[in-house]
C-alpha cells in the first residue's frame, strides 16, 4: 500500500471559478455540517480572495460568514484554509504592511488555520514577509508556487523559489496550477525535486480541469510525493473548475494509495444543497461556459475562472468590431473567430510582457492588453497603445520582478513615456495606514469589532466596506439580482408585461387607502424619492403617506415582512383608493 493522500474541498474557489458571488452565511451554516458528514476531507478552503470582498458587495458582513463557516469544521477536526494574495492581501492591489499583519491575527481568531500565500509573479519578496506575519498571528503559512508553462518556468526555477520559501519558515508548499496547464510529467518532477531535498515539507496540489490535464497531473504528483489534493463536488466540479472528489478518490485508490472513504449519502446532500444555493441567487451570476472544458486554454494559458469574464468582454466589443469592419467594407467577424484571435494575441503578448504567471491579477492585465491590441489592430492601428496604469506598474517592476525579460519594444515604449523601471521591494511603495482607518471609524462612530475585524475589513476593502455600511451595496446588489432574474425570464421568450405579471403573482400589493398624492418621504434637505426595488420592510414599518385632497396625511403601513419587487406609483404621483402603490414579496 502506498502513502496516504488527503483531500481538501476548495468550496470557496468552486464558487469563484464559476461566477461572481459566494454563498451567504446562512447557506454556509447549512452546508458545513454536511461537508463534515461526508467524512473524506482533512481540509476545507473557507475564505480569502474573492470571499470577504464579495460578501461586502452584496451587503453582508464577511466576518460573520467566515466565523459561521469555520466553527463547525473546526469542531469536527477539519483544518480550514484561505487564499492570500501576499502583497495584495485579499484584494487585487497592494496592501500596507500593518494591514497585512492585522489580517493574520483576525483570520486566526475567526477560525482559519492555514493561509495559502501566493504572488502572481512568484516574487519571494511578496511572500516571505507574509510567512513571518502569519506565524506571528498564529496561522500556518502555506507558501505557493504559481504554476505555468513557459521557457523560463523550469523545474530549477520553481525549486529555487521553494528553497527560499522553506528557508524563510514555510512548513508547506502549494503547487497552484490555476489554469490547469502544468504538464503532468513536469509537475511530477517538480514535486519529486522538492520532496527529495525537503522530505518533511507538506505539498498540496491545486489544479483546474479546464484544458483536461488535471487527473493525469494529480496521479503524477501523488506518485512523486504530494500529500494533499484539492478537489470539488458536484454540481460545480469539472468544466473549468476542479476535479470531483469521487473520481480522484477512485483513481488514487486503484493506484494503491490510502484514501478516505466518501459518505455518499452526505455527498448527495451536499450536492443538493449547493444546487439549491445556485437556484436561490448565485446561479444568476454564473457563466454557463464555465461548465465547458477547452483544450484551447493550453495555448493561451488563461485560468479557467477567467473565461467567463473574457467572454463577457468579447461579447461587449464584438458588435463594435463588426461596425468597424463594416465601415472598412469588410465581412463581419463571428464571435468564435474573435475568441481565436484573442487567444492568439495572448500568446503573442505574454512572452513580450515577461511571462508573468497568468493568475490574479496579472492574468487580467495580460488579457486586457491582448483585448486592446485586438481592437487596435481591427482599426488598423498599432499594438500597445492602450496599456492601463496597473499593467504599467507590473511592467515597471512595482508589483515585483517579472520571471522573463521584457521585449525591446516594451522597454522602448516605457522610455518614450518617461516611465522609470524599479527593482525596489514592492512593499516600500505602500506605507502603513491603519491609523488613518482608525480615525475614520472613530469619526463615523463605527465599532472596531471583535478582534478588530471590522477595522480590518475597512482597511482591506475600504470602498466596499463604506458601501456596505451605508446600505448602498445591498441596494445595488438587489437591483442587479432583479435585472438578472428579468433577463433570465426574457431569455425564455417572456415579454416585459409577462415578466411583470409573474413578479406580481409572487407578491402582495400595498394599496392606497384613499385618493391622493403618494409621498414616500418628506425631505427637508433635498428632493424626496421613491424607495428602491429590493428594499426590505418589516411588518409594522411605515411605508408612505397619502396626501389627501382635504389636506390630511394618511400613513400607509406594510402589514407584513417583505422586499419591494415593483414600485407602481412614484413619488408625488396621484392615486385612487385601492390602486396599487407597490408590490412586496413576502419573506
Name every feature range the model reports, one short phrase each.
Residues 5-13, 19, 42-46, 78-85, ...:
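Hydrophobic faces of well-ordered beta-strands that scaffold small-molecule active sites
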Residues 15, 36-54, 292-297, 301-507:
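Terminal or standalone catalytic/regulatory effector modules within metabolic enzymes
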Residues 33, 48-163, 180-183:
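Active-site beta->alpha loop and helix N-cap motifs at the rims of alpha/beta catalytic domains
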Residues 117, 177, 224-243:
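Glycine-rich phosphate-binding active-site loops on the catalytic face of alpha/beta enzymes
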Residues 156-165, 211-227:
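Catalytic cores of alpha/beta
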Residues 237-262:
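C-terminal helical cap(s) of enzyme catalytic domains, especially alpha/beta-barrels
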Residues 519-536, 560, 564-573:
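Short histidine-centered loop motifs in beta-beta connectors
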Residues 532-556, 576-587:
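Short hydrophobic beta/alpha edge segments that flank linear recognition/processing sites
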Amino acid at each position: 500500500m502506498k502513502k496516504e493522500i488527503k483531500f481538501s474541498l476548495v468550496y470557496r474557489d468552486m464558487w469563484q471559478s464559476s461566477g461572481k458571488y459566494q454563498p451567504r452565511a446562512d447557506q454556509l451554516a447549512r452546508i458545513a455540517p454536511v461537508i463534515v458528514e461526508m467524512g473524506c476531507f482533512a481540509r476545507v478552503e473557507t475564505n480569502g480572495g474573492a470571499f470577504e470582498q464579495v460578501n461586502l458587495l452584496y451587503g453582508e458582513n464577511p466576518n460573520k460568514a467566515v466565523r459561521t463557516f469555520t466553527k463547525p469544521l473546526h469542531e469536527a477536526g477539519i483544518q480550514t484554509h484561505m487564499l492570500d494574495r501576499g502583497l495584495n492581501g485579499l484584494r487585487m492591489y497592494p496592501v500596507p504592511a500593518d494591514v497585512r499583519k492585522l489580517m493574520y491575527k483576525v483570520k486566526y481568531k475567526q477560525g482559519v488555520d492555514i493561509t495559502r500565500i501566493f504572488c502572481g509573479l512568484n516574487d519571494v519578496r511578496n511572500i516571505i514577509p507574509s510567512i513571518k506575519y502569519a506565524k506571528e498571528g498564529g496561522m500556518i503559512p502555506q507558501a505557493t508556487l504559481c504554476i505555468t508553462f513557459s521557457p523560463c518556468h523550469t523545474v530549477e526555477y520553481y525549486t529555487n523559489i521553494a528553497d527560499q520559501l522553506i528557508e524563510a519558515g514555510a512548513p508547506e508548499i502549494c503547487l497552484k496550477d490555476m489554469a490547469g496547464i502544468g504538464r503532468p510529467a513536469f509537475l511530477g518532477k517538480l514535486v519529486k525535486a522538492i520532496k527529495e531535498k525537503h522530505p518533511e515539507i507538506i505539498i498540496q496540489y491545486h489544479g483546474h480541469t479546464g484544458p483536461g490535464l488535471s487527473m493525469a497531473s494529480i496521479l503524477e504528483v501523488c506518485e512523486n510525493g504530494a500529500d494533499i489534493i484539492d478537489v470539488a463536488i458536484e454540481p460545480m466540479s469539472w468544466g473549468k473548475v476542479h476535479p470531483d472528489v469521487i473520481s480522484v478518490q477512485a483513481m488514487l485508490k486503484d493506484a494503491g494509495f490510502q484514501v478516505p472513504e466518501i459518505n455518499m449519502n452526505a455527498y448527495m446532500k451536499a450536492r443538493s444543497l449547493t444546487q439549491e444555493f445556485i437556484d436561490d441567487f448565485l446561479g444568476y451570476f454564473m457563466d454557463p461556459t464555465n461548465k465547458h472544458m477547452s483544450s484551447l486554454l493550453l495555448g493561451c494559458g488563461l485560468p479557467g475562472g477567467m473565461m467567463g469574464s473574457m467572454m463577457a468582454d468579447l461579447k461587449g466589443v464584438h458588435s463594435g468590431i463588426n461596425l468597424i469592419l463594416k465601415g472598412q467594407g469588410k465581412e463581419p467577424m463571428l464571435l468564435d473567430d474573435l475568441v481565436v484571435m484573442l487567444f492568439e494575441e495572448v500568446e503573442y503578448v505574454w512572452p513580450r510582457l515577461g511571462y508573468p504567471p497568468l493568475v490574479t491579477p496579472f492574468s487580467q492585465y495580460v488579457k486586457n492588453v491582448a483585448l486592446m491590441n485586438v481592437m487596435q489592430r481591427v482599426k488598423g492601428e498599432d499594438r500597445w497603445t492602450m496599456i492601463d496604469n496597473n499593467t504599467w506598474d507590473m511592467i515597471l517592476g512595482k508589483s515585483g520582478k517579472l520571471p522573463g525579460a521584457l521585449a525591446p519594444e516594451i522597454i522602448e515604449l516605457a522610455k518614450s513615456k518617461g516611465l522609470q523601471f524599479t527593482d525596489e521591494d514592492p512593499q516600500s511603495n505602500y506605507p502603513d495606514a491603519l491609523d488613518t482607518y482608525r480615525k475614520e471609524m472613530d469619526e463615523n462612530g463605527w465599532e472596531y469589532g471583535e478582534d478588530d475585524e471590522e477595522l480590518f475589513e475597512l482597511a482591506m476593502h475600504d470602498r466596499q466596506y463604506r458601501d456596505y455600511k451605508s446600505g448602498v451595496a445591498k441596494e445595488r446588489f438587489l437591483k442587479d439580482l432583479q435585472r438578472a432574474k428579468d433577463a433570465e425570464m426574457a431569455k425564455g421568450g417572456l415579454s416585459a408585461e409577462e415578466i411583470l405579471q409573474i413578479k406580481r403573482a409572487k407578491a402582495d400589493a400595498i394599496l392606497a387607502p384613499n385618493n391622493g398624492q403618494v409621498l414616500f418621504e418628506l425631505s427637508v434637505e433635498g428632493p424626496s424619492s421613491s424607495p428602491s426595488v429590493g428594499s426590505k420592510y418589516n411588518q409594522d414599518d411605515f411605508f408612505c403617506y397619502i396626501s389627501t385632497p382635504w389636506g390630511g396625511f394618511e400613513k400607509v403601513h406594510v402589514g407584513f415582512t417583505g422586499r419591494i419587487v415593483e414600485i407602481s406609483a412614484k413619488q408625488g404621483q396621484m392615486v385612487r383608493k385601492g390602486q396599487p402603490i407597490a408590490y412586496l414579496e413576502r419573506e
